[in-house]
Amino acid sequence: MLKNDRLLRALNRQPVDRTPVWLMRQAGRYLPEYRATRARAGSFLGMAKNPDIACEVTLQPLQRFPLDAAILFSDILTIPDAMGLELYFVEGEGPKFRHPVRDAAAIHRLGVPDMETELRYVMDAVRVIRRELDGSVPLIGFSGSPWTLACYMIEGGGSKEYARIKAMAFNAPELLHHLLNTVTDAVIAYLAAQRAAGAQALQVFDTWGGVLSPAMYREFSLPYLTRIARELERGDGAERTPLVLFGKGNGAYVADLAASGAEAVGVDWTISLADAAQRAGGRVALQGNLDPATLYGSPEAIRAEVGKTLDSYAQGNGGSREGHVFNLGHGMSPDMNPEHVGVLVEAVQTLSKR
């Protein structure tokens, strides 16, 4: 039995006593205890692939701040790693793949990994975290979106231009759709396995959907997000596991995402929550959307911006604050001040009381 079910109630647009809050990358390098754990583990993957350490890191922000959810400590690139692309990290450059997929032969060789063998460490982490949380707050599981994973798989790492995947979209769209369908199958299986292991809410991160033109987004990202929302088994009624579709730069597509079948849409700070709520039309909950850079501001500035964000949602939602989960519009950065996170969380709790 959950002692704090605010997140799940808000995602299902049910009444809550105040707006729930959690933060993308709430377990991360801005916390000195995270940096100490990483030094002990030796690497990011050394933490992510050890269920006990992944649990320790997942719980660190909850030991500091009264957050309303834990999110699994992992990486969006676990699926392609398990497909054989071999993930590694370069200091200062981020994730890379030793075996990117750039031709038909490589793409057709890909299959859906077995979730309890190749990705057992993720499921074990979910089980350990659920046990340690002991019903205090819900645990969020997650995956990267098919488009975002395909970007990394084809580019071989992060990119500014996305030249290789966009070239494939123009020159060999059928091949790219084949890859996206395979990855979508894997994402659905991955999220279902996390749910079976104990995840109580699920989020898909479409980090790079915003690099696409509207026409390309509607061809290469939206249909696959919709497939996930419609095909992922999440249960029924009060026991249904809510799904959040988050995208960077997805403001223009809120209405499309609201029609996908997901329970909630996460937006970044490039659209006002008032506008997003009007576009959503009461069909989904909304999550977001404070600019993470606000945390570089003074405590007074942070409180003011939190208030504006809460008010913006209510303004677009007929004066009601129901159906809103407070979050940042993207993940936190390593140089942010943990004390400012405390200010943010306290401000949400104080200013959103019903």
Swiss-Prot record:
GO MF term list: uroporphyrinogen decarboxylase activity
NCBIfam families to which the protein is assigned, alphabetical: hemE (TIGR01464)
Protein name, as recorded: Uroporphyrinogen decarboxylase
CC terms in the record's Gene Ontology section: cytosol
Native source organism of the sequence: Xanthomonas axonopodis pv. citri (strain 306)
Functional pathway: Porphyrin-containing compound metabolism; protoporphyrin-IX biosynthesis; coproporphyrinogen-III from 5-aminolevulinate: step 4/4
InterPro entries from the UniProt entry: UROD/MetE-like_sf, Uroporphyrinogen_deCO2ase_HemE, Uroporphyrinogen_deCOase
Subunit field text: Homodimer.
Enzyme class: lyase
Name of the gene this protein is made from: hemE
